[in-house]
Amino acid sequence: TAHQAGIQVIEITGDCYETALAVAKEAGIYNDGDLAIKDEDFQKMSDDEVKEIIHRLRVISRCSPNTKLRLVTLAQEIGKSVAMTGDGVNDSPALKQADVGFGMQDGSDVAKEAADIVLTDNNFASIVKGVELGRTFLHNIMMFLEFQLPINFVLLIFCAIYPVVAANAEFLAPVQI
């Protein structure tokens, strides 16, 4: 799940508060102790207040395009990497502002154009799977380098010292290159 991967999911929707909260609970986004607010309450908050609550925020209902853009911008200001999903014209400013914008295949052309990546299966779980694959790939590269660099360093030192020890040896023989 996104939570297990260390990804904080915030549902920003045009749905009414009750519907948004029910969807968030069913999807595992919202738990006890988390924060769900209406757009009108979000608009009344200062930027500093939003930055203080953003780690607990899980749902914003009746959301406007300006709220989506503001939330993305404020999350970036506190150092979060932000991915945004959207399928409507109203999502395009936030999709462009986000570090990674995910459009939906069945979404509007404007949203797909604003997005960095288009999810052809329209499935949020594809993002989590992509993050998992990316982290696995990075881990494998790091493990390869952790193994390969010391070996290559030792061989380089050996190639530099051997000609000094063996007086008649070439510095780098064709076989060594």
Model regions: which residues?
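Short active-site oxyanion
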Residues: G6-I10, L57-V59
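Acidic, divalent-metal-coordinating active-site segment for phosphoryl/phosphodiester hydrolysis
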Residues: T1-Q4, C16-A27, N66-V72, G88-A98
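Short intrinsically disordered, low-complexity coil segments enriched in acidic
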Residues: T1-Q8, I177
